[in-house]
C-alpha cells in the first residue's frame, strides 16, 4: 500500500493525475454494496408486486449508467472507455437485505475501482429511491472494493 495521496500535488492542492506515460494494461475491479430493509419491503421486490415495476432491473441499469458517468460525478476521475460493466443483485431474505455486486473492465492507463464502486452505490440508491414510499429507514452499507487487477499496484483482494 502506498503512503502518498496521488491526487494531491506538492503544494497540497487537488489535481488530476497525469496518466500520459502509463502503460495500457487490462484492468478490472469488483465492488459490493448492501441495502437493508424490512422483510415486507424485500418480499414486495422479490415477488414483483412493487408498484413501480421491476426494482432489480431498474437498479441494474442505473448501476451500469452510473459506472459510465463516474468521471462526471467524482471530480478527479478520468473519463474511461469501459469495455464491460456488470451489476448483479441478490436478495438475501435471511438478512433482510439485497447484495449488489459490480464488475468493471477496460484496457487502459488507469484503474476502474471508482467505476465499480459508483455502480454498486448507485444501484443501491436506486433501490432506495424506488422503495422509499414503502419504507424510509432502509440502510445502505458496506460499500467496498472487493478486488482489483491490473496496473502498477497489481492485484488487490479484500479479506
From Swiss-Prot:
Pfam families: MoaC. Substrate binds at residues 76-78, 114-115. It comes from the Bacteria. One of its GO terms (biological process) is Mo-molybdopterin cofactor biosynthetic process. Catalyzes the conversion of (8S)-3',8-cyclo-7,8-dihydroguanosine 5'-triphosphate to cyclic pyranopterin monophosphate (cPMP). NCBIfam families: moaC (TIGR00581), PRK09364.1 (NF006870). This is Cyclic pyranopterin monophosphate synthase. It comes from Shewanella sp. (strain ANA-3). The gene is moaC.
Amino acid at each position: 500500500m502506498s503512503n502518498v495521496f496521488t491526487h494531491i500535488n506538492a503544494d497540497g492542492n487537488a489535481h488530476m493525475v497525469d496518466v500520459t506515460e502509463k502503460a495500457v494494461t487490462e484492468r478490472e475491479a469488483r465492488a459490493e454494496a448492501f441495502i437493508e430493509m424490512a422483510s415486507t419491503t424485500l418480499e414486495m421486490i422479490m415477488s414483483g408486486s412493487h408498484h413501480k415495476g421491476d426494482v432489480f432491473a431498474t437498479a441494474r441499469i442505473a448501476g451500469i449508467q452510473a459506472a459510465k458517468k463516474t468521471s462526471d460525478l467524482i471530480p478527479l476521475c478520468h473519463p474511461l472507455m469501459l469495455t464491460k460493466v456488470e451489476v448483479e443483485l441478490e436478495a438475501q431474505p435471511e438478512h433482510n437485505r439485497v447484495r449488489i455486486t459490480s464488475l468493471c473492465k477496460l484496457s487502459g492507463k488507469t484503474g476502474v475501482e471508482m467505476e465499480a464502486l459508483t455502480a454498486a452505490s448507485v444501484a443501491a440508491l436506486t433501490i432506495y429511491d424506488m422503495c422509499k414510499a414503502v419504507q424510509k429507514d432502509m440502510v445502505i452499507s458496506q460499500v467496498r472494493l472487493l478486488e482489483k487487477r491490473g496496473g502498477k499496484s497489481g492485484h488487490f483482494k479484500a479479506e
